[in-house]
Amino acid sequence: EEGIGEYGIPNMYKNREPRFYQAITYSGKTWQKTTKQIYFYKGSGDDNSKADMSYSGYLLYKGMNRDLLNQGSNAKSKYRAGMLFRLADFYLLYAEALNHVNPSDERIIAHIDSVRYRAGIPLLKDIKPEIKGNQALQEEAIRKERRIELFAEGQRYFDVRRWMCADEEGYKQGGPVHGMNMNADNLEDFMERTAFETRIFERRMYLYPIPLNEI
């Protein structure tokens, strides 16, 4: 939905699933330690004139310490444990392996739904019962779940390469990367979808060697 809604929040950010709000800092979002809304258009105070601000109109929220506030005597930095492995990752990897061995295995949907249940969203067994046993549709569901659940955890780069789909529509790692119009000086114009960089991916890049220090 286009336009700016109540409280200065763009309508396109409303009624998203819970993981969106736990992962992304978007225009109109309020940092919980203050009542100040965050905006990224020119002159907003958080635009890209600052070296540490957004180039796309979004910032990462997932994994950020919600007790920090760069004002007054508040804590401005804190160490946090990094995520190497998560149970959700294992559930989805196992579901993917089962789907390649035996698509009719009931554990496939059950493991995907374990991740969705924790996220507080409807279960596939209830809203998409027709995909059960269909290898292609189950694979699609697993890939979508990995993209959302494991966002910003360093998995996507490797997922699209092991699936050999990094040059396919919907998974492309090359071409223009879009965000908001960071040159706009008001929220309405800022919400225009705008390319902010162009990346290159060619099929030969699937064959990049693994660095020795990674082995």
Predicted regions and their residues:
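Acidic/polar-rich alpha-helix caps and helix-coil junctions
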Residues: 1-215
